[in-house]
Amino acid sequence: LYGDGNALVNLNVEQDIKKYIALSETNFSVSKDGGTVEVLVTGYGGDAKLYASPDYKSYGYLNMQWAKVTKGLLQAKLQITLDANQYSEERTAGIICYFLDDDDQLIAESDYIEVKQAGQGALTSTDMSRDGEVKKLQSHTKGNVGLPIVIMGDGFVDKQIASGYYDECMQIGLDNFFSEEPFKSLREYFDVWQVTTVSETNIMDGEHNTAINSYPTGEGTLITGDYQKVFGYGSNISELMESGLFPETTFLVMMNTDTYAGTCYFGFGNESGIVNLAVGYAPLIFSP
């Protein structure tokens, strides 16, 4: 450009490249037996790092792996693998991709990826012989008397018990319970028993019969169940009954569903007043 004095003026114009992430597809379906889907991820994040994260409910059964990642103008493939779905109902895994800079500041993020997985549907039991089986999972090593916990499941059919799935779920539920304080630091003070419950069906809707008839009501996080059946299964534990500590027992019921809900009932009492007896119902957020 020339001004009035014929002087040459230089103009430097810089344009930043927009940071973005685009996906080849955002909706997928996987069979109940599990499988892998692949998403082509393109975009630009400069020197930022690329990440992918599932929603909180998907951590237990979803694995992700990046393949063929190029820097600069990004081109990458995200492989998403789902384990077999042991629940009766369909479930949906959610994933999002994003760029973070060196200060962990969000630079860009993708649309939401949804992977729907079919459920097992209705299963029924034909062999009820293991219903009520008892085994001790842990004996206290501190304190004069162990604090009693009884863990059992609901909505598990005979095949899921025979395969070892029931035992795995009970162990995961127990480990999750003892992952929180103050129970984590006090675990050595507890005695823990497991009771096997065989349900007629895995459908937990209040209309089908399960061992404890627990089910999410659909009203917020409320779960209902037949605590008298819980106590009935607990009465199979001769050591617990002979100790006189049944009124001090915490019962944990692990439900064969990943529905987001959870309820604890407190305030049971006897002729002497309030006791420490409690029943807690919880879904299997993290299953094998």
Description of each model-found segment:
Residues 20-23, 45-79:
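Surface-exposed binding patches on compact interaction domains or structured appendages
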Residues 33-39, 76, 86-95:
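Short, solvent-exposed loop/turn segments enriched in Ser/Thr/Gly
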Residues 5-16, 106-120:
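C-terminal edge beta-strand
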Residues 160-169, 269-287:
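Short pre-active-site segment immediately N-terminal to the catalytic Zn-binding motif
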Residues 203-204, 234-248, 255-274:
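Catalytic zinc-binding patch centered on the HExxH motif and its immediate surroundings
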Residues 18-41:
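Beta-sheet-dominated interaction scaffolds and their linkers
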Residues 121-246:
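Propeptide-to-catalytic entry region of secreted or membrane-anchored zinc metalloproteases
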Residues 1-4, 78, 89-101:
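A short beta-strand micro-motif common to beta-rich folds, especially ectodomain repeats
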